[in-house]
Amino acid sequence: NENDTEFTFYMRPGMKWSDGMPVTTEDVRFAVEDVLKNEEIYPVFPTRYRSLFSVEGTPCELTVIDDYTFKLTFDQPYGSFPAHLAISDWVQYNDLLKPAHYLKQFHIDYTPLEELLPLMEAESIAEDEWFNLFNTKQMTHLSQICNPQKMDHPVLTPWYMTSHDAGVYMWERNPYYFKVDTEGNQLPYIDYLRSDLISERETLMLRALTGEFDYPGERASLKKLPLMREQEDAGLINIYMARMHRLPYSARLNYTYPDPVWR
């Protein structure tokens, strides 16, 4: 609204999780009312869903309008909310949109404790800590798609993990991914991916320089650029200088510098 206290969201009808189940406002309602507002799962309600992005702010209120429309209301203007929703803490959609059909089987409000106990025992979780079982199953962060414990968690990403072994992760194409190209072809194009977890940057660079990888990620070092150019000239690799949100350097401004001109 004009006061930046109400934000209405319109979801995409027909959108599906990677297991084929529809994405609806029930996933939002479950995420807000049964997860974020559950004090055992979240002893402290997340700051970015409080007024003014403050720990002292009032938690938002959710209104479900229909299967694909919902509204979040704050008691004070919160104009930066969309920006925080987009970039804050690399959370992505994971705390506002959860696959309710999957996670309800680990939630005490939907599954009796006696059914949860065998799962808790398998994870060495105390009998009075069902919420720790839930937290091992839910995703709260973008990076957790790489967590083998959460491999069965439905996602909205173009690929999902199918196996892992000794630092090698295998991924398959999400057949329900919501994007298409300009010709209407379903994305992504690539059916399978393999990711190798390499702890040493030097090892990564040596393997990348021989063309062993299709993509070494953002761990590639600019210090090695001259050597990489030589390998590119030899036809072993291709270098693309991507325009990214992350850079190998940063500039921090000192707002309290004593010289008023510089300040």
What are these regions (language model features)?
Residues 2-44, 50, 54-64, 73, ...:
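Extracytoplasmic/periplasmic ligand-capture domains
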Residues 10, 48-137:
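Surface-exposed binding/hinge segments that line
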Residues 140-142, 148:
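Secretory-pathway ectodomains
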